[in-house]
Structure formats: structure tokens, C-alpha cells
Amino acid sequence: MHAHLAATTSREDFRQLAVDHRVVPVTRKVLADSETPLSAYRKLAANRPSTFLLESAENGRSWSQWSFIGVGAPSALTIRDGEAVWLGTVPQDAPTGGDPLHVLQATLELLATAAMPGLPPLSSGMVGFFAYDMVRRLERLPELALNDLQLPDMLLLLATDVAAVDHHEGTITLIANAVNWNGTDERVDQAYDDAIARLDVMTAALGQPLPSTIATFSRPDPRRRAQCTIEEYGAIVDHLVDQIAAGEAFQVVPSQRFEVDTDVDPIDVYRMLRVTNPSPYMYLLHVPNSDGATGFSIVGSSPEALVTVKDGRVTTHPIAGTRWRGQTEEEDQLLEKELLADEKERAEHLMLVDLGRNDLGRVCTPGTVRVEDYSHVERYSHVMHMVSTVTGLLGEGRTALDAVTACFPAGTLSGAPKVRSMELIEEVEKTRRGLYGGVVGYLDFAGNADFAIAIRTALMRDGIAYVQAGGGVVADSNGPYEYIEASNKARAVLNAIAAAETLTSLDFGVALAPGRVAARGEAGNQGRL
């Protein structure tokens, strides 16, 4: 079946690459201009554990060129009892046990492979998340908040089989990565044949029809349980304002968690987020447990990167200052002017830009850190933000993982100064943050990285969706306002969950030939919901 389909990577090319590449991609490009990223995900990944879908909508409007589907991941690196542990097949020669960040860096070095021209931006790598509480491995913090969800502080999939959807071309590049553990000719040929077999399986899956996913939906007000009442959250804000007045911090970013009982499929929440809240970082990730089943799912629509590393260039985009979008272009322009003229918002933004410069200064070559495009407004689907860009060149001997940990966690989710703000957060929040305020993204084997801050994100496990949101508290903050602001930020995901629960498939009961329309009454259950 399909064995006659040529791979872009020939056996001879593969043999040559295997001489000095530990990870060798074998690719096949197919025309798939009738597929959407979601239909391709359903066909290729089928909602299985250890699969993912990563997309991007620039400024909440036009979709970016690429969507990435994680089809297969034989291994995942996570943490158990404070030690690094591999789930699934342990990669040959990969370290295990000990400090998880050291094991991750050693794995990236073990699999380090120079970028190859012509490949999509993500072709293999470690894809997953760092929870906010990973910071406890970087800084000494008190342990006061209840660790009720018991989430791992880190889990990264070793993504070997990836599909890259090119929206500009209407093509999908299927990628089966062969990990070259043993450079003998026999082993290299075996690795190539195995990669071709996986490409054939992916190609066949893409060619299969799917049941219709056409559905109606509505947008009801979301249900939720809040951790705090408006009075309780107001008391937290008042306490932090007092701490700021006493000189303990300039800004602190408290939050609270919201919960919803739901049995809705995470992919349907993702579908609704694509409709209602498209953002620069969209992600669906089914996180495996030790048995190989899905332990929990992550669904998110984040507007904000923590850090990106591309060809040695490190970039972070501090975001601070928000206005809701207007109904018209004229309203948007007025709101932009108001935001840029707001002295309080500008002061907060400058503080976070300085924090970003300091973070990058820890890992970049001295003299290369620059602030570019300072304090401009970017519009998203529902809000507009004040944004700046801070860049630098990665220092000698520094890695993409160093850049991630230097910036972690985001100042926009902790405060300034960062460590003291996190200590104050630990004193006032009821439960550990878990995923909220951490990051979702990837480190590839060519030394690049791209991580989004885990906000506007749901963690779905055992019939409950957890959504967390907060906001920056400064000297003149108001408790009731901050409560409403945090609730509004959570609504984007809570609304998507509520809408997903109303999805009703339209089952017409008759398979129609392409281009043929059913006659009146031909389908016995036409229109039945």
C-alpha cells in the first residue's frame, strides 16, 4: 500500500546525512488543499495520548503559514519524586534520574542535529510544558500553597513523527524522524526502512474519510466555581497593596483558579477557541501518564510568548497594558490612544521591559541586548495590548534551555522584582499554580525554542476543567476591579468550554457523492439533531 510513493528523502541522501546527524528526517510532501489542521489532526493523531496540535493566528486575525501535528512520540521526559524519568521507550544513551533540567539539556545535546534547509520550522524536538512550579528548581521559594492537583512540573514529548500543514501551499509535509543510534550500514538502512513504513502509515491515514464534524453551537454564559469571593480576592489585593507601599515590591501578579465540571472533549474546546479567541499561540496537547494513557489535556489560546530562540537570536515580547477591543475601527483607534497615554499602564510596561532586558542579559552576549519597537499596540480578537520587543544574541556556551530558564517565569505573571513577588504570591494564593503561568512549547534539536506563557488555557482532567487568571497589582490597585479583571480574562476559555458543550452534530444519514445535493426527503433523518 502506497509503498510506491516517493519520499523526499532518498535512501542515499539518508545514508549521507546519517554520517553526521543523530536525528535524520525522512519526509514526504502531499497536496492536501481540502484538509484543515483539525481534520488532519483527527486523521493522523486521532486524539491519541502523546499527540499535539500547535497553531498560530497573527494578532488574533489571519492564520500563520504553519500548523504542526504531533503524530507519534515514543518517549516523554517528566518528573517523578523530584527526579527525571522517561515514560515509554527510553532513548538509547539518554540519561535518567537526577535533576530534570540537566537530563533535558543532556538529551538535547545527545540528539543535537544541525538544521536542514527546506524543512518546516518544527520537524522534531521536545514538545510539552513547564509548570509554573518548575521555578522552585531555579529559586528558593516558601512552600505554603496547597499542591492539590499534583501535576508534574515538566513533561516534554520526544516528537519523532510530525505533520506540518502549509496553509500557503495547501500541502502537508509528513516527517518521520529516524534516530541514528548506531552508524553501521545495516542499522542505517533499517532506520530508513522503518521511517518509510511510518510515512506510509501516515499517508494512508490522511487518505481515509472522516465522519462529518459539521455542527451547530450556541454561546451560553459559562458555569464556573471560583476559588475566591470578590471580598476574599479584594482582601488579597489590599494586602499586596500594603506590601507594595511598604517597599516589598513594585508589582505583584496574584491569580485565582476557576473550575468547571464537564465531560466535553478537549478537541471541541479547541475548536471553539479557534472560533472565538484565535491567538498567536494555539495548542492542544494530550499529556500521557505512566501507563501511556492520556493523564490530562491542555487546551490554550495564549497571546504571549515567554521567549523564542532562533539561530542564536533570543527574543521576548513584554506585554503590559490592556484595553478591550472597540466595535469599530474608530473606537479601536481611540482606545489605542487612550492606552498609550495612560501613565500607570506605561509605567507598568516600562518595568516589565526592564525585567525582560535583565533576563536576557543573563544569557546573552554583553552589549547585544536591545529594545526594539518599544511600546506599540497590538490588537487581538477581543483585546489590545501594549507590547515591546527585547532581543539579544545567545552568549558563548549558552543554550536555548538557558534562555528559557533565565526568563522563567514571565514577569507579567509574577511581578517585579520577580523573586520577592513570587514569595508574596505563595503567601496569598490558596493552591499551587501548576500549569498557569508556566509555558507550553518546544525545544528543537537544532538549538531553537519557542514557548508561550500558559494563560487563557484550560487543563482538563477527570471531568473537570481548570482555568486560572489574574492581573498585576500596583500601589493604587482596587480589589473589586482586579477581581472582575481576572474573571474577564478567564472568560475566553470558560466561554469556549460552554460553547463546546452545545455542539450538536448534523447527521444527515446519507453519504453523498461529491457535488451531489440530496433531494427533498431523500435522507430519512436529514436535519435531525
From Swiss-Prot:
GO terms for molecular function: anthranilate synthase activity; metal ion binding. InterPro entries: ADC_synthase, Anth_synth_I-like, Anth_synth_I_N, Anth_synth_I_PabB, Chorismate_C. It catalyses: chorismate + L-glutamine = anthranilate + pyruvate + L-glutamate + H(+). The lineage of its organism: Bacteria, Bacillati, Actinomycetota, Actinomycetes, Mycobacteriales. It comes from Mycobacterium leprae (strain TN). It comes from the Bacteria. The keyword Oxidoreductase does not apply. This is Anthranilate synthase component 1. Binds 1 Mg(2+) ion per subunit. SUPFAM superfamilies: ADC synthase. GO terms for biological process: L-tryptophan biosynthetic process. The keyword Amino-acid biosynthesis applies. The gene is trpE. Chorismate binds at residues 321-322, 436, 456, 470-472. Mg(2+) binds at residues 348, 485. Heterotetramer consisting of two non-identical subunits: a beta subunit (TrpG) and a large alpha subunit (TrpE). Part of a heterotetrameric complex that catalyzes the two-step biosynthesis of anthranilate, an intermediate in the biosynthesis of L-tryptophan. In the first step, the glutamine-binding beta subunit (TrpG) of anthranilate synthase (AS) provides the glutamine amidotransferase activity which generates ammonia as a substrate that, along with chorismate, is used in the second step, catalyzed by the large alpha subunit of AS (TrpE) to produce anthranilate. In the absence of TrpG, TrpE can synthesize anthranilate directly from chorismate and high concentrations of ammonia. Its cofactor is Mg(2+). Its EC number is 4.1.3.27. Pathway: Amino-acid biosynthesis; L-tryptophan biosynthesis; L-tryptophan from chorismate: step 1/5. L-tryptophan binds at residues 56, 280-282. Belongs to the anthranilate synthase component I family. Keywords: Amino-acid biosynthesis, Aromatic amino acid biosynthesis, Lyase, Magnesium, Metal-binding, Tryptophan biosynthesis. Feedback inhibited by tryptophan.
